Amino acid sequence: MDNLIIGGTEVKSRLFIGTGKYSSNSIIPRILKKSKSQVITIALRRVDITSKEENMLNYINKDCILLPNTSGARNAEEAIRLARIARAAGCGNWIKIEVISDNKYLLPDNYETIKATEVLAKEGFIVLPYMNPDLMDTKRLVNAGAAAVMPLGAPIGTNRGIATKEMIRIIIDEIATPIVVDAGIGKPSQAAEAMEMGADAVLVNTAIASAGNPVLMAEAFGLAVESGRKAFLAKLGQEKLMAEASSPLTGFLR
């Protein structure tokens, strides 16, 4: 069985979906249905979790796993506070840690992220930290209690693909904890590439939300992730420098 287990929970779809940038929350149910996604992120700073009117949570199937994120947190203390607010509001124990103090490139602060992860993991949260891909920091996050790690492929919202692929390859090779490639994936082919590399899942938001037909694009990403995973399990053929004929070059009829 090819199961993805995070924090003791089986995750059936390896495509995680973000909820930012959609023109209307009403499109979210169709996005989830077509993508077959089970894990969906919500930014606490963008959602009034106490409101009953036009609440994003009303559009999310109860079977989905909510992954609130701490977007807007500039340090560990702010991330910890947001995580506690999310759990108190009924959003569950899953939390995506985002600590960003860089306002230009929006790159995560690994040091503060590690601190927040350690505190929240001890409090019983299922912590998925968003991070700059660095092997030693990944090991520190795992030791701090991360249930999965989320290295960035490229800066948030850029659709530039997996610019950090060599660093992510190293992490995949060295870390047994689930790896979810997050940020920068702009095409279904790039999501498939991440899965072919051996990533356990990918998180996509901008590429779907900014598409001409977001619902169709969500379906395309779902298929790409499934295909990429199957390719990884099938074991890709080895690349070679020299040509190698697929048919014999001797013994032709004369």
From Swiss-Prot:
A Pfam family recorded for this sequence: ThiG
Pathway where it operates: Cofactor biosynthesis; thiamine diphosphate biosynthesis
CDD domains xref list: ThiG
Chief location bin: cytoplasm
One Gene Ontology term from the biological process aspect of the record: thiamine diphosphate biosynthetic process
Catalytic residues as annotated in Swiss-Prot or TrEMBL: K96
Record field: catalytic activity: [ThiS sulfur-carrier protein]-C-terminal-Gly-aminoethanethioate + 2-iminoacetate + 1-deoxy-D-xylulose 5-phosphate = [ThiS sulfur-carrier protein]-C-terminal Gly-Gly + 2-[(2R,5Z)-2-carboxy-4-methylthiazol-5(2H)-ylidene]ethyl phosphate + 2 H2O + H(+)
Keywords: Cytoplasm, Schiff base, Thiamine biosynthesis, Transferase
Residues reported in the UniProt entry to bind 1-deoxy-D-xylulose 5-phosphate: G157, A183, G184, N205, T206
Highest taxon of source: Bacteria
Entry GO terms, CC: cytoplasm
InterPro entries tied to this protein: Aldolase_TIM, Thiazole_synthase_ThiG, ThiG
Cell membrane keyword on record: no
Compartment list: Cytoplasm
GO MF term (any one): thiazole synthase activity
Its EC number(s): 2.8.1.10
Membership in a protein family: Belongs to the ThiG family.
Record's function text: Catalyzes the rearrangement of 1-deoxy-D-xylulose 5-phosphate (DXP) to produce the thiazole phosphate moiety of thiamine. Sulfur is provided by the thiocarboxylate moiety of the carrier protein ThiS. In vitro, sulfur can be provided by H(2)S.
Name of this chain's protein: Thiazole synthase
Native species: Clostridium kluyveri (strain ATCC 8527 / DSM 555 / NBRC 12016 / NCIMB 10680 / K1)
